[in-house]
Amino acid sequence: MTPRRSVSHPNIEERRARGKAARELVPRSSHSAWKPAADRPDPVGLLEEQNTTREPDLVPVRHGRMLASPFTFYRGAAKIMAADLDGTPTAGLDVQLCGDAHLSNFGAFASPERRLLFDLNDFDETLPGPFEYDVKRMAASFTIAARNNGFSAADAHAVTLMSAASYRKAMADFAQMGTLDIWYARMDEQDLVAAMRKAAAKAGKHPKRAKVVERAEATGVKALEKAHSRDSLQALSKLGELVDGRYRIVSRPPIVVPMRELQSTYGLSGDEVEQALHEQFRAYRATLRDDQRQLLERFELVDVARKVVGVGSVGTRAFIGLLQGRDQGDPLFLQVKEATRSVLEDYLPRSRYKQHGERVVYGQRMMQAASDIFLGWTKGLDVERHFYWRQLRDMKGSADVEAMIPTGLTLYARVCGWTLARAHARSGDPVALHAYLGKRDEFEQSIADFSRSYADQNELDYGAFAAAVRSGRLEAVEGI
């Protein structure tokens, strides 16, 4: 007797046929086009809409960070691009989306086994949806970053092409792998170093180019070494101060403001703040696995502060918590970030998770090769506000994209493309995706064409944003 199955399990040929059929309906060449819709929303208006739920005193800081360049503007413009992607061609091959897969949302961090991994690291906008959305967000970010760094048009095109080509080629590999092999696939420190050395070996026949690649490799290795030192003890040296024999978080407004200085902001007394913090901490612990909860219970919550992070997230409520284990030399910093409605939910089916913190945690666990053991979620004092929790620094490292030359950014594009494909292969169908993407370069050429056109649009939007600041429509505080 064959048991009834609640989940469909098509065979390899059926999965491959699905991908090839999608080519007929949505040719790969169709992804090259970008033209703003006649009823395209005002990009500045979309940002103003986001600002209504953000901390009023931090909104000008967000604007100031976005004003730095078209690249930083793009980092904060996920809502604008979500609106633009709606209506673009999609093949009907859905995956768990990062939702904001620009090149600065990739980075290094420690796995639970203490191995340094490279992966996506921001999931605030995660939602199931068309794989093309993440690929286009990633690829366009490489074009915009390349222009920001002063690359020639040819170099910008080559870098962007590499990101999409790497995605396509990696998906071809994942299509041949077993299900568990895909799930366990990861890019660790050794893989990154090997990729850099492989690039250096290829450049060896060209002495001038070889020197450039060697410098890029040295910079990459140095960044990885630096990541190893970024832990809670290092964070304590930067964010903590010893007062009356006990550590607390330093005050550096508006970037870091301890809760002891924010009582009036939230309309609470000191005792009410203390009670609220511990209630939140208990609620968060309840979302952890039993063994992880027991581990966390060995730490005492010592202090909490509001801390500004990133570009696009500025103005959403974000806090850090200082915890102490066996003694003052055993700290743990946790980050608590507000999780709002995904920018994609205006255009895609709503998340099955009503709690947006849980939505973020699920997306992160689905897409990352390994995730923080302290990932959890809570509701705020205002039950309409949702939060997710994670470690603040756990060997976290990021690439200095704005300092990269073409060789370095091309290598980075290769790594990011592979990583995004691996993340998509975990939740999507790599066989169907590979069958759709094909063996030739048509897909990446189309994505590179789209990225060039969208980078032009981003520059126009940045100009409109800058004009809104100059006119007084938006307030911006720069340099913070």
Region roles according to the model:
Residues M1-P10:
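General secondary-structure propensity
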Residues P10-N11, R15-S29, K35-C98, L103-H228, ...:
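Conserved ATP-binding subdomain of kinase catalytic cores across diverse folds
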Residues Q190-A276:
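Long, low-complexity segments enriched in small/aliphatic residues
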